[in-house]
A protein has these predicted regions:
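Switch/communication elements of ASCE P-loop NTPase nucleotide-binding domains
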Residues: 1-47, 270-399, 599-610
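Beta-strand elements of well-folded, non-transmembrane domains
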Residues: 25, 77-81, 128-132
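Conserved P-loop NTP-binding catalytic core
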Residues: 40-118
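Acidic, Mg2+-coordinating catalytic modules of nucleic-acid enzymes
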Residues: 165, 395-408, 412-610
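Conserved beta-strand position immediately N-terminal to the Walker
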Residues: 24-27, 174, 406
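Extended helical coiled-coil dimerization/tether regions that scaffold
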Residues: 185-187, 191, 195-292, 296-312
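Electropositive, glycine-dotted interaction segments
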Residues: 90-207
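Flexible phosphate/Mg2+-sensing switch loops adjacent to catalytic phosphate-binding sites
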Residues: 47-70, 306, 342, 367-369, ...
């Protein structure tokens, strides 16, 4: 069994969302885009009560719920084996769910099976309202007969068939939250560990009873109250007690409360590396500590698989605290063993491990959450450019798409220069740069690698996923042609930037060097092994090094080491960032608006070097 669709209404920052989920999906997006909201909506629907914290006003959209405010989540579940409602009486009956049929290709539901709608499905709902007089949320889980006629689940005339937790346990939904640094996951203090022990093994009752007896009645000579340094204190206390109480109680010191529960609660996980000492989990690295919950859940999943039960696992940020090779191993293992995995991540490496149709970019604007696949379907014979973006450069593409704006430059060298300059600039920040002077481009603008000047193709792919694609082109006829190819797109690029007439990125680098021309020509000549008589000579040389990364990095380091060049580069990059982020109201002397090419939806600028 697995979840194929999720609808959310009125939950936290999301007023509405309709999300299609595959067997193994990764949710990618910037901070506060709604990834955790999706995961916790699933926990509300399918998780145990302890899996989700108590709902408050802030869980309702707008954080100020009135009597009519509702949280509503509806999930569609399919994957029943066999594909016949008669074999699943716990899900389908007059007192339970209504059978529906799902079309895997069209991703729609039907009341009856047909050539498209072939997979048996059921819909589960969760609703919540905030009771103002009691200052707490009232919740309900139920089977959904018909979304269109559902109405208010809390209405007096609403006749809903509630769903019991035991039925939901058949789906086997488990959540691994991003916060997983508790060091006692593998101990009897953990409910999950107790459940795994009950499922996969047996309680070590005999060993616990023996340990309890030893702790309760320690052998003579080992009792703490008889040890030097303590015996005098204990003896004096006993003398006082004899004088005060007829029963003359005697003080004894024990390591636990001496019942079975206290023995179990005192168990602490330890780990030994090779021949090294055995150390408690709290003395281990954070990576090992954070893996404990996953280790337990994998054992739980194995037990469910052995009995033919499904196992759906939602994992927030699996990349936390572990190295890239372990990230790949972990994610691949989860995808191989679970019926369904739902992963959230900020790591391009983790996101790139999922196929393009299962890489969902999450974005929330004005309360509407969208989840768009990177590309679905992927062409059977992708173009050379699509191969580079979707396969060879998927990490770079995913990383760029996580930004507020996405910039599509004319070529790979533009990407290399922008990244090199921004990195070198950031490495020369001072304490005074925390405010308006801080370099902002890399924070808010992601740059997509573009080969062979395939701006139109790249724009088509990016605009299908991201709401803020922009383009950067050279100031020549070819650049104008690339602009003409995308300006009629629907929607068009939000912002377009031209370099000056006849300029490419290399001219811009020479312009930055011109802030202290004589010193920079000498320094760059030494670093690059070529003397430069003037700025034009530097530009000509850089144009021959378009794909040579050492030149980009060396030149950027030299330039950003000079205060005048650093100030000029910061002015340029921050002005570019301002134009791309808010082209409607951007006002900077370095970029002038081209009114003849601009429209209400597309703002065109040209760089004007000062």
């Amino acid at each position: 069994m697995h979840i194929v669709r999720l609808k959310i209404s009125g939950f936290r920052g999301v007023s509405a969302a309709d999300i299609t989920l595959g067997r193994h999906a990764v949710l990618v997006g910037p901070n506060n885009s709604g990834k955790t909201t999706i995961i916790e909506a699933l926990a509300l629907l399918f998780g145990r009560d302890r899996l989700v914290r108590r709902l408050t006003e802030h869980d309702f959209h707008g954080s100020a719920p009135d009597e009519q405010a509702r949280i509503l989540c509806i999930a569609t579940v399919t994957g029943f084996t066999p594909n016949d409602p008669q074999h699943h009486s716990s899900w389908f009956s007059p007192e339970r769910g209504v059978e529906k049929w799902y079309a895997p290709n069209a991703k729609t539901l039907s009341a009856a099976p047909d050539a498209q709608h072939t997979d048996l499905a059921v819909q589960i709902g969760f609703a919540a309202r905030f009771v103002l007089d009691e200052l707490e949320a009232e919740t309900i889980r139920f089977f959904v007969d018909d979304e269109a006629t559902l109405g208010d689940p809390f209405a007096e005339d609403a006749h809903l068939r509630t769903i019991h937790t035991k039925i939901l346990q058949e789906l086997g939904f488990f959540l691994v939250p991003a916060s997983r640094t508790w060091d006692k996951w593998i101990s009897f203090s953990s409910e999950l560990f107790r459940r795994v022990v009950a499922t996969r093994g047996d309680m070590p009752a005999q060993a616990v009873r023996a340990e309890r007896a030893r702790l309760w009645t320690p052998p003579e000579g080992t009792r703490l109250e008889d040890q030097p340094g303590l015996s005098e204190i204990v003896g004096a206390a006993n003398d006082e007690l004899r004088a005060l109480m007829a029963s003359a109680p005697r003080l004894q010191l024990r390591l636990t409360s001496t019942d079975s529960d206290s023995v179990l609660e005192s168990v602490v996980p330890h780990f030994a590396h090779g021949t090294g000492p055995t150390l408690p989990s709290q003395r281990q690295g954070t990576g090992l500590v954070s893996l404990q919950s996953l280790l337990l859940l994998m054992q739980f999943g194995k037990a469910r698989a052995e009995t033919g039960q499904s196992f759906v696992l939602a994992v927030e940020e699996p990349e936390l605290h572990i190295q890239p090779s372990q990230q790949k191993r972990l994610v691949n293992r989860l995808n191989a063993l679970c019926n369904q995995t739902l992963v959230t991540t900020h790591s391009p490496l983790v996101a790139a491990m999922f196929p393009a149709p299962d890489t969902l970019f999450i974005e929330t604007r004005a309360g509407i959450l969208s989840a768009k696949p990177l590309m679905d379907p992927v062409p059977a014979q992708p173009t050379n450019h699509q191969q580079h973006l979707l396969f060879a450069w998927r990490q770079k593409l995913v990383g760029a798409l996580m930004h507020e704006c996405v910039l599509i430059p004319e070529g790979v060298s533009d990407v290399a220069w922008l990244e090199a300059l921004q990195t070198a600039l950031e490495l020369h920040q001072g304490w005074q740069d925390a405010g308006d002077g801080a370099p902002l481009l890399s924070t808010f603008v992601g740059v997509v690698p573009t080969i062979d000047a395939k701006i139109a193709d790249t724009f088509a792919l990016v605009s299908a996923v991201h709401a803020r694609p922009c383009i950067l082109v050279d100031g020549d006829n070819e650049g104008r042609g690339y602009f003409d190819a995308v300006k009629t797109s629907n929607p068009p690029p939000r912002a377009v930037v031209f370099w000056p007439q006849g300029w490419a990125m290399e001219h811009v680098v020479s312009w930055i060097a011109g802030a202290d021309e004589s010193a920079m020509l000498a320094a760059l000549g030494t670093a690059l092994g070529t003397p430069f008589a003037n700025a034009q000579a530097l530009t000509d040389h850089l144009l021959t090094q378009k794909s040579y990364a050492p030149t980009h990095e060396s030149a950027a380091i030299i330039l950003m080491g000079n205060a005048a060049c650093r100030a000029r580069a910061a002015q340029l990059l921050n002005a570019l960032c301002a134009v791309l982020r808010d082209p409607l109201s951007a006002n900077t002397p370095l970029f002038t608006r081209i009114a003849a090419d601009s429209t209400a939806d597309m703002h065109v600028f040209r760089f004007v070097p000062a």
